[in-house]
């Protein structure tokens, strides 16, 4: 049975807002996994995916098939989910300050104590994910090919994840300093040194493969690029 590890953050007027979080223990033989969605609170698809996944995880745990400890935060941003204007959900930016909800996580995580409710919320999310071996932060685009956004240090191992998720494109990023959630978690684990060259990965002069790798491109339903390592089109 999932353990409720939810926590509260302060709203703009100081009232408590709940961040729902649950943990499935598994048998401990697999890696620790952290899954979350809704940092940008108007990006709905990931929230739905994780709510449905929790049902499957509950069944798998009950049947003794779950190997990993899995933490799920299906709607990570109670501050943004309540922001409406003329009937439209505005969940990308904090209405009171204009702050992008997925920026500044690195600064917030370093504060002791955080100064604002946004910083408290961001630091709490980073701390919750800090012990994970695998972390996926789900976002939704308006209109785009399915893509995986992955740090260079996890490539080419990330091809297996891209194949499993049936992605068309993998966007490979270096340390950019934008303070996004994934950037802050990377920093927490010290993934600053490029694992292939043994040097810091800020500002590669050779950026031929820095931004986009086709995986796998499709045209008229037929794969153009095939993953030779996994054999998955």
Regions found by a protein language model. Name each.
Residues 1-233:
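Structured catalytic-domain cores with a bias toward divalent-metal coordination
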